[in-house]
Amino acid sequence: MIKLIVTKSEKVQDLFVSSVKKFSKMSGVCVLVAKPYSAVANKLKGSRILFIDTLSESEEENVIHVPPSNLTALSIAVNQALQSFEGKKFLVFDSFSTLTVRNPPKVVSKFALFLLERVRTWDVEAVIIVAKEGTDAELLAVLKQSADKVEER
């Protein structure tokens, strides 16, 4: 199932942390686009979580660095990370819309379609969080169409 959460920008990080904690019995991947690993490390601990950090090059064992401007590398990293886990898996993006800071919105929309199609094929539980303010209308429409459930908070 793919859940899209549309919220105020000041709520994004709290919703990200609470979303990840709901998957405490599963293995999964957290993609950090708005805050680096160091900002969430103390709030989210667990050997079954792999972080893809697009903002810093952390030396932690459970962290992979991918530049936010390289969506192909990000897609490959998500794919490989999810495939490394057995059983039920999850994927949580802390602020998907932030990808448009380093990439054109149309490119991010295509990336979203591709990635969410793959997530559905892999039977992964996914939570995509976007800030209401400043999110490209086309990207938001694509995310809403691709999601199984949309929550506005």
Language-model region placement:
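Phosphate-binding/switch region of NTP-binding enzymes
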Residues: 124-125, 131-153
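Glycine-rich P-loop/Walker A and Walker A-like loops and their local beta1-loop-alpha1 context
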Residues: 1-42
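Structural motif
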Residues: 4, 90-93, 127
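Short acidic, S/G/P-rich loop/turn micro-motifs used as interaction or catalytic elements
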Residues: 9-13, 36-38, 58, 97-105, ...
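Short, structured coil segments at secondary-structure junctions
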Residues: 24, 44-47, 145-147
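Phosphate-binding/switch loop-helix module in NTP-utilizing enzymes
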Residues: 59-114
